[in-house]
Amino acid sequence: MRKPDQITIDRALLLYLLHAVEPHGLLGDVKLQQLGFLCELQMFNRGLKAFHFEFVRYAYGAFSKDLDNDLLSLRRKERVENFSPSEKASEVLTLLNEAVDGVKQNEEVIDILQAVVDRYGPLDSSEVTKSVEAVELSTPEQPTLNLPIRDISFHTTLLVPSRIEVSSEFTVPSPRLARLSTAMGY
């Protein structure tokens, strides 16, 4: 279960992801889920933790209920319209950029997120899903065997951030975290 500070960071980074992918055109639920998964996976591969979304195998690649709930919550708070950050989200993005500047691990997280968006943002949803389904992971049932996600049973857990050890994590000092939360309407 995510802690309140993790939820705040997840929502702020989700807004950043939506902002970063916006120039690439139409975005839908499936593509957003796949981009979130790829970002989180790449961060873990680099020993970093930023998003705290648990992902399961779904009909279209990977799916996170936490990511879905955060998106709905940001829509209710009028920080997201469809899949684009609203005017009310601009303060959140400014505060997040301030939290990133000069903090090595935070800068690395944003670099990874941007690299994923640059690589997969221009692709359509089905192409991104195919890329996700080609990723090889081990499952809790078979921890020594790596399988492409397309061969893993539906609803099987793919990523559990709380169980993954990393060398550093995206951090925001408490006062700025409170300002981020307020800027998001919480």
Regions found by a protein language model. Give the residues of each.
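Domain-edge interaction signal
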Residues: 1-186
